[in-house]
Design a protein with these regions (language model features):
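Acidic/aromatic/glycine-rich contiguous surface patches that form carbohydrate-binding/processing clefts
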Residues: 215
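Extended intrinsically disordered or low-complexity regions, especially N/C-terminal cytosolic tails and loops
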Residues: 1-207, 219-304
Length: 304
């Protein structure tokens, strides 16, 4: 495999023009944008939509600005999705802490007791790891002022306080580790969700949250986990192929469906308006919508 050598900004631009057929009308602006974003993040990240599959070169008429516009669109998407994913994360944390403490208590001896979890079979090592994570946060020298305060003043940290330091991935595992009666109560806080359905939503949402938080490419991201089939698929008339829904399982539209299922009606409407504004700000090609996993009638989800 040929080694990738360092190229100056001028050399990068010349390579794109001469070797890849990209039109660049303003070289100085292109250099400024490469400095701002980096070649890998901008060009490698967003070139595929604009390339010819046969030659690997850009299609005729594609300009540097087209790539940067898609980059900006994706950047706005990340900010929007992260905002509302964090809303759900806070709500799930609040719900789990409430129902756990209501059932078992809020002391360390309560939430560090494996008997208060579904401690069987394959879940045992997951719960053991979770106990290490929870107990590891109970330190006088914690980075979090509220943890230090509770440890100093009360020598323990209530679960409803400790939940704030958990990542969404840890929260997802904590939910999956709960006994059925706790999971059912949490699901009831979000309507008529099934226990496993919410578990899959949290697993999928964790991956999308990480993509947003780390500024990775979002619009065509796919997760290994997939949402379970639910009534929302049928109500949106999402087509199937070989018995499997072709949109909304593990693509970005899956995250839209999660937001629809877990946000309040008012919050989802606010999110939906912002998403529409994002599309209006960045007119995109249908090929991008396809890569996002958005069906042609995706707007129906606001009324579903």
């Amino acid at each position: 495999m040929k080694k990738k050598c360092f190229l100056t900004y001028d050399e990068q631009i010349s390579f794109l023009v001469r070797e890849k057929g990209l039109h660049i009308s303003d070289r100085n602006q292109a250099k400024a944008l490469l400095l701002k974003t980096g070649y890998f993040s901008l060009i490698n990240g967003y070139k595929e939509v604009f390339k010819q599959s046969e030659t690997g070169k850009f299609r005729n008429g594609i300009d540097f600005e087209n790539i940067y516009e898609l980059y900006c669109f994706d950047d706005d998407l990340r900010s929007l999705f992260l905002k509302y994913i964090l809303m759900i994360e806070r709500t799930v944390k609040s719900s789990l802490a409430y129902h756990f403490c209501e059932t078992y208590g809020d002391l360390g001896v309560d939430y560090l007791n494996v008997n208060h979890y579904d401690y069987f079979g394959k879940k045992k090592p997951v719960i053991d790891k979770l106990m290490q994570v929870l107990s590891g946060q109970l330190r006088m020298d914690s980075d979090y002022a509220y943890i230090r305060h509770y440890m100093t003043a009360y020598h323990y940290v209530p679960l409803w306080v400790l939940m704030n330091v958990l990542t969404l991935g840890q929260l997802s595992k904590m939910y999956a580790s709960q006994k059925g009666r706790i999971q059912i109560k949490i699901c009831q806080d979000f309507g008529a969700l099934r226990v496993n359905e919410l578990g899959k939503m949290l697993a999928v949402m964790t991956k999308f949250r990480n993509v947003c938080a780390h500024s990775d490419r979002l619009f065509d991201f796919r997760t290994k986990d997939a949402l379970l089939d639910c009534n929302l698929f049928a109500s949106l008339s999402i087509p199937k192929e070989k018995g499997r829904y072709i949109y909304g399982k593990n693509d970005l539209f899956a995250q839209v469906m999660i937001l629809k299922s877990l946000l309040s009606e008012a919050d989802f409407h606010s999110y939906f308006q912002c998403l529409q504004e994002c599309f209006e700000k960045h007119p995109i090609h249908k090929a991008v919508l396809d890569k996002m996993g958005f069906p042609s009638h995706w707007e129906r989800i606001n009324e579903a």
